[in-house]
Amino acid sequence: MNKLLPAFALSLSMLGASFAAIAEVPRTAAPENASVYIIEPKDGATVDKTFTVRFGLKGMGVAPAGVDAPDTGHHHLLIDLDQLPAMNGPLPATENVVHFGKGQTETELTLAPGKHTLQLLLGDKNHVPFDPPVLSKKITVTVK
């Protein structure tokens, strides 16, 4: 049994290193001067419980996830995030990181009453943020 323990420990460490290597994927270079922004609502707006968020993009095009076309990506809406997600792998799909992998440029959003922050982050065909990140200004809305 004691002879198996070092081999088991080595196997676990190699497995962990493999997962770390898989988690970090190459990032696509962003075109110079590419920018993403929220068209609507405006920063500081008061909105109804359900409201429209419209996405804007300059210097790049929008394409669905999985489409390998130069200088294109798709939107991810960051909701109430204090810290940006990791930029070295695919963005997680959570209630705070909403994927628009079909190439959508707007959405209807329903949030609880109160203050909320919204920010856009463009992802490549694999949901990986560009390098450097194409990230909008964070806006704040108040839901009535």
Identify what each model region corresponds to.
Residues L84-M87, G123-D131:
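Short acidic/polar inter-strand loop motif in beta-rich domains
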Residues F51-F55, T105, G114-L122:
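Short, well-structured beta-strand segments within conserved domains
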Residues V25-D48:
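Short, compositionally biased P/S/T/A/G/V-rich stretches that sit at domain boundaries
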Residues A7-A17:
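Bacterial N-terminal signal peptides
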Residues V67-H75, L135:
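Short coil-to-beta strand junction motifs in C2/discoidin
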Residues K49, G73, A112-G114:
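A glycine-anchored, Pro-Gly-centered beta-turn/N-cap motif
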Residues G56-V67:
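Short amphipathic, basic-aromatic surface patches that mediate peripheral association
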Residues A112-H127, L135-V141:
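Internal, hydrophobic beta-strand segments that form the core of beta-sheet-rich folds
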